[in-house]
A protein has these predicted regions:
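Chromatin/DNA-recognition segments of nuclear transcriptional regulators
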Residues: 57-70, 79
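N-terminal Rossmann-like dinucleotide/flavin-binding domain of flavoprotein oxidoreductases
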Residues: 73-98
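Alpha/beta-hydrolase superfamily serine-hydrolase fold, recognizing
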Residues: 5-41, 45-51, 57-62, 89, ...
Length: 425
């Protein structure tokens, strides 16, 4: 009995020592210079690092990390991060929340009690929102707090789409669901009390990809697309921002080349054994690359006044015939890679949010440049203290960041002035 108790005490003490050392390591880990509120962000990064290690271990023992129990675990963890804690009372009395089904797809609606539409517009101005999570993780429920805050701040009705996710439902399932819901809203605007002339599509990360793709398909009906840290292309993984985050492991739990490449592979239903080909930019034919390489010419398309990087895109120079025929077809599909739509002159007005600490930074900036070049009205806001996913901390949860609140304030001002045509201070 005494030996057993002693062993238990030794194990307990050992765990305390290990935990204390781990906390010490996290607290003293170097953070990227220039990142505001780093003491909060280091813990977001650590959560992602732990998930990454766990995913690696599961992969090593042959467990598919996209299985439903793992999704539930990840979604629960991020739900705690994004939403109020149980003992907090964050009440939006001016927002009505409902669940519904539009054309077979589950949605959650967040409707302000007071309608902010201009007098000549019947129904609510409406944001159709597509959540992020690499087309694999997260859900509308995880985003509940931020979505309530978005509706409360903007005074727009928000319709959040619970689209199908990979690997169970790869491309084009998520796109089809988002398109179906947006079409349904357009076709049933009167009965849904939606102002048909003020329909906005929006999303962050993978959701930004879906918003851009839907905006292209329904350009005649979309008034504005809001792209927040969007994933827009898998042609080249050596843009300056990808290089920046390959050269130094900055915030790998939040954003990293390996993480984004894996997301694209799951969405595209590409065998993960080919990951090394994508990491080496050998996954597409040189013919296809030549057709679109100008869209990724950082010397031409990155706004020089922003000074986001001193690097240039390293263009593809090799190809592997094992995967390139299949991936070429994906690249050519604007539903999958909206960045490579040949004619973008018809695209709706665009509001783009980019972050300095994000591997996806440069593709959004270069896409914005090409839209401007083709006569599209573009409003670009780059946040030097922002990171991938930072916009979700603008309010609605127990953690709020100043840079996120600034981004929300600027978006609200734009919507009021340019979309609703309201007088602003």
């Amino acid at each position: 009995m005494g030996r057993t108790l002693g062993a238990v005490i030794c194990v307990f003490v050992g765990l305390i020592v290990c935990l204390s050392f781990h906390v010490y390591t996290v607290l003293h880990r170097a953070m990227p210079p220039g990142l505001a509120e780093a003491e909060k962000i280091r813990w977001f990064d650590e959560l992602g690092r732990l998930a990454r290690r766990g995913s690696g271990l599961m992969h090593d023992v042959g467990i598919n990390i996209g299985i439903q129990p793992m999704k539930i675990f990840i979604n629960t963890a991020f739900s705690i991060l994004f939403n109020p804690l149980p003992w907090q009372r964050v009440v939006y009395r001016n927002i009505r929340v409902n669940q519904d089904v539009y054309d077979g797809v589950t949605v959650s609606t967040y409707t302000p009690v007071k309608n902010s539409s201009p007098p000549n517009c019947q129904g609510y101005p409406t944001i159709v929102y597509f959540h992020g999570g690499g087309w694999t993780w997260l859900s509308v429920g995880v985003y509940d707090g931020p979505l309530k805050n978005l509706a409360n701040k903007t005074k727009f009705k928000v319709v959040a789409v619970e689209y199908r996710t990979a690997p169970q439902d790869p491309f084009p399932a998520a796109y089809d669901d988002c398109l179906a819901v947006t079409k349904y809203i357009v076709q049933h605007s009167k009965e849904l009390n939606v102002c048909k002339d003020l329909i906005v599509v929006a999303g962050d990360g993978a959701g930004g990809n879906l918003a851009a793709a839907v905006a292209i398909e329904l350009s005649s009906f979309v008034r504005l697309q809001i792209l927040i840290n969007p994933a827009l292309q898998m042609l080249n993984f050596a843009t300056p921002s990808y290089q920046d985050f390959s050269d130094m492991e900055m915030l790998p739990g939040i954003t990293s080349p390996e993480k984004e490449i894996t997301n694209w592979m799951r969405y595209g239903n590409i065998n993960l054994s080919f990951k090394h080909l994508l990491q080496g930019n050998r996954h597409v034919s040189l013919e296809s690359y030549a057709a679109f390489s100008d869209f990724l010419n950082s010397s031409k398309r990155l706004p020089s006044p922003l000074k986001v990087s001193n690097k240039s895109t390293i263009h593809n120079s090799e190809s592997n015939d094992t995967v390139s025929p299949f991936i070429d077809n994906l690249i050519l599909d604007s539903r999958f890679n909206p960045m490579f739509t040949q004619d973008v002159s018809f695209v709706a007005d665009t509001y783009i949010i980019t972050s300095q600490f994000d591997v996806l930074r440069d593709e959004a900036l270069m896409f914005g440049h090409r839209l401007l070049e083709n006569g599209v009205k573009v409003e670009l806001h780059h946040y030097y203290h922002g990171f991938h996913g930072f916009f979700l901390f603008a309010g609605g949860g127990w953690i709020e960041l100043k840079e996120s609140q600034k981004a929300m304030e600027q978006l609200v001002n734009y919507l009021n002035k340019e979309i609703l045509r309201l007088k602003t201070n």
